[in-house]
């Protein structure tokens, strides 16, 4: 890692910069999936307790984002997609990012334990550690499997939400985890297909950098095939139902078809049209998880099997 203390910019940060430090776009998916996991769990939760629990899970997700920005300031500075973030742009110092991350980590875990239960709080603490240390500090710069293993951090929130309600883990929460876990690699690899040069310049060993785009295309399609059974299986559990299953069938058919298109594309074709198919698949992947969890929520309201 480069010297993170080099990113010390002037004290010109506004409130929005500190919000950006928490990666609000990423946090929005964390909040939503955690809420769904909590709300569809078999044990009812007081709405105020549910609100507090989701709020503290969101703070934990924000803490992870701040710690990630603290450590990754050097590579963020050389990537077009991330150069404008608060730390590499100099609006927030690296010490401030670290302090915010540590403070929110402690606060979120403590308050979740008091609001819900200590099993869920411990799970949140593990998730923050996994994202900040296992993924950000260890995996991201050391292996092309970084987002495969590290993707677990983004898949834990619905399990944490479920644990807030039940105090434990169920097959339903494990399948929600699996849905996000196996969705993460094709989502990020699709991005890496048209952002390869950025990752290469930053020294991040994404699969496109270490093994090339052809191998990455094969992996994307393979993961769409692995993902589909877990997504569909969820439809036959206590939280599933015909509405969710119908949505999942359509989404997985589109996802597999998109993966097949990517697999069959040559690099010359992709470069000729500016990676149009790859960018379209990436946009589809953004809706894939959100619509699955929205379908679970609606299915819960209308009733399942």
Curated annotation (Swiss-Prot):
Keywords: Cell inner membrane, Cell membrane, Heme biosynthesis, Membrane, Transferase, Transmembrane, Transmembrane helix. It catalyses: heme b + (2E,6E)-farnesyl diphosphate + H2O = Fe(II)-heme o + diphosphate. The chain crosses the membrane at residues 26-46, 47-67, 98-118, 119-139, 147-167, 174-194, 220-240, 243-263, 284-304. It is found in: Cell inner membrane. The keyword Membrane applies. GO terms for molecular function: protoheme IX farnesyltransferase activity. The keyword Magnesium does not apply. It comes from the Bacteria. Pathway: Porphyrin-containing compound metabolism; heme O biosynthesis; heme O from protoheme: step 1/1. PROSITE patterns: UBIA. One of its GO terms (biological process) is heme O biosynthetic process. It is a multi-pass membrane protein. Gene3D superfamilies: UbiA prenyltransferase (1.10.357.140). GO terms for cellular component: plasma membrane. Its EC number is 2.5.1.141. Interacts with CtaA. NCBIfam families: cyoE_ctaB (TIGR01473), PRK04375.1-2 (NF003349). Carbon 2 of the heme B porphyrin ring is defined according to the Fischer nomenclature. Converts heme B (protoheme IX) to heme O by substitution of the vinyl group on carbon 2 of heme B porphyrin ring with a hydroxyethyl farnesyl side group. Belongs to the UbiA prenyltransferase family. Protoheme IX farnesyltransferase subfamily. This is Protoheme IX farnesyltransferase.
């Amino acid at each position: 890692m480069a010297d993170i203390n080099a990113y010390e910019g002037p004290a010109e940060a506004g409130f929005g910069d500190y919000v950006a430090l928490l990666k609000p776009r990423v946090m929005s998916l964390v909040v939503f999936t955690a809420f769904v996991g909590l709300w569809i769990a078999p044990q009812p939760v007081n709405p105020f307790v549910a609100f507090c629990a989701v709020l503290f899970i969101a703070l934990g997700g924000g803490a992870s984002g701040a710690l990630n920005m603290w450590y990754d300031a050097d590579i963020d500075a050389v990537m077009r997609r991330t150069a404008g973030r608060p730390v590499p742009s100099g609006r927030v110092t690296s010490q401030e990012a670290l302090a915010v991350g540590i403070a929110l980590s402690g606060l979120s875990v403590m308050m979740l334990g008091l609001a819900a239960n200590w099993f869920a709080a411990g799970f949140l603490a593990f998730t923050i550690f996994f994202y900040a240390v296992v993924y950000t500090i260890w995996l991201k710069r050391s292996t092309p499997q970084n987002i495969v293993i590290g993707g677990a951090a983004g898949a834990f929130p619905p399990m944490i939400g479920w644990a807030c309600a039940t105090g434990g883990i169920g097959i339903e929460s494990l399948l929600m985890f699996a849905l996000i876990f196996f969705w993460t690699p094709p989502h990020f690899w699709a991005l890496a297909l048209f952002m390869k040069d950025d990752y290469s310049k930053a020294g991040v060993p994404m699969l496109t950098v270490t093994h090339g785009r052809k191998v990455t295309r094969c992996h994307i399609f393979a993961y769409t095939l692995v993902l589909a059974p877990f997504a569909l299986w969820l439809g036959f559990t206590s939280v599933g139902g015909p509405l969710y299953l119908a949505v999942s069938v359509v989404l997985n058919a589109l996802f597999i078809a998109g993966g097949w298109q990517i697999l069959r594309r040559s690099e010359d074709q992709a470069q000729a049209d500016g990676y149009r198919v790859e960018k379209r698949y990436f946009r589809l992947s953004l809706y894939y998880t959100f619509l699955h969890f929205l379908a679970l929520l609606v299915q819960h309201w209308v009733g399942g099997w």
